[in-house]
């Protein structure tokens, strides 16, 4: 590292000890001790130094590495960082995919339940409408039955009134028939007590449409001619 020397006197590190200040300057041991008020010769900041050797802090040791080696190390480190981040991203994506899959399954399950609930609601709604129709029909049928029952309850009284009117019509004949017919006793008297025994009666008492004057009732041929001859049915008068 020929490029390292004291920034104040120019001495090389192989000739004396060198120190690295906190402000980024390098001074030899003599210059460091002779620093006025312990200030940096260049920037006038307080001197805080670390000896440059193999025991230097790792973060300060990086300042003295070969740039090419440092670049190679940085590339390797960068590769490790990239690989680490890629692996973590892959794991992250897998976790997110698993969560998305679970969410999809939960969504599908919820959707299936929603469809089942919707179908059940529609089924119950249809059953409710059918029950309403049945209830309406039952009410109409009930009203018809109640009307029929009322009609049947009123019908006996109507039949009773009709029968009563018919009974009154039969038991109370018109006054004209009574006046025309008369009681049975009067009718018997009007018949002159006509005897049905034709043998005990003379033919002169029988009413006929033929005049009986100047007729000899004792002649048998006359009676036969009047009541028997030339007729389809024989005379009801018994011959003597």
Curated annotation (Swiss-Prot):
In terms of InterPro entries, this protein maps to:
Zip3/RNF212-like, Znf_RING, Znf_RING/FYVE/PHD
GO CC list: chromosome; synaptonemal complex
A single GO BP annotation from the record? homologous chromosome pairing at meiosis
Report the SS bond pairs.
none
Q: Recall the GO molecular function terms of this protein's record.
A: SUMO transferase activity; zinc ion binding
Q: Where are the zinc fingers (RING-type)?
A: 6-44
**For the region Disordered, what residue ranges are annotated?**
152-189
Tissues in which the protein is found: Expressed in the germline.
Keywords in alphabetical order, please: Chromosome, DNA recombination, Meiosis, Metal-binding, Zinc, Zinc-finger
Task: Report the transmembrane regions from the record.
Answer: none
Q: Where in the cell is it found?
A: Chromosome
Q: Share what the entry says about its subunit structure, partners included.
A: Interacts with zhp-1; the interaction is required for their chromosome association and stability.
What does this protein's UniProt record list under function? Recruited co-dependently with zhp-1 to the synaptonemal complex between homologous chromosome pairs to regulate the formation and number of crossover events between homologs during meiotic recombination. Together with zhp-1, promotes the accumulation of pro-crossover proteins, including zhp-3 and zhp-4, at a designated crossover site along the recombination intermediate. Limits the number of crossover sites along a recombination intermediate by restricting the association of these pro-crossover proteins with other recombination sites during late prophase.
UniProt-recorded name of the protein:
Zip homologous protein 2
Species assigned in the record: Caenorhabditis elegans
């Amino acid at each position: 590292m020929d490029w390292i020397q004291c920034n104040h006197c120019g001495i090389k590190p192989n000739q004396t000890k060198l120190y690295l200040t906190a402000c980024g300057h390098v001074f030899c041991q003599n210059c460091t001790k002779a620093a006025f008020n312990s200030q940096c010769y260049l920037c006038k900041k307080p001197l805080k130094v670390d000896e440059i050797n193999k025991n230097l802090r790792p973060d300060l040791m990086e300042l003295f590495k070969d740039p090419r080696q440092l670049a190679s190390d940085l590339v390797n480190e960068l590769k490790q960082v990239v690989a680490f981040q890629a692996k973590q991203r892959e794991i992250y994506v897998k976790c997110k995919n698993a969560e998305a899959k679970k969410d999809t399954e939960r969504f599908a399950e919820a959707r299936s339940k929603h469809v089942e609930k919707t179908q059940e609601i529609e089924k119950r709604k249809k059953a409710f409408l059918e029950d309403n129709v049945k209830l309406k029909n039952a009410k109409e049928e009930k009203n018809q039955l109640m009307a029929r029952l009322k009609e049947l309850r009123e019908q006996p009284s109507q039949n009773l009134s009709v029968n009563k009117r018919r009974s009154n019509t039969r038991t109370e004949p018109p006054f004209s028939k009574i006046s025309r017919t008369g009681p049975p006793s009067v009718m018997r008297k009007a018949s002159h007590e006509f005897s049905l025994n034709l043998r005990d009666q003379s033919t002169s008492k029988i009413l006929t449409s033929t005049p009986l004057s100047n007729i000899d009732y004792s002649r048998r041929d006359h009676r036969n001619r009047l009541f028997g001859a030339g007729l389809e049915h024989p005379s009801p008068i018994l011959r003597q």
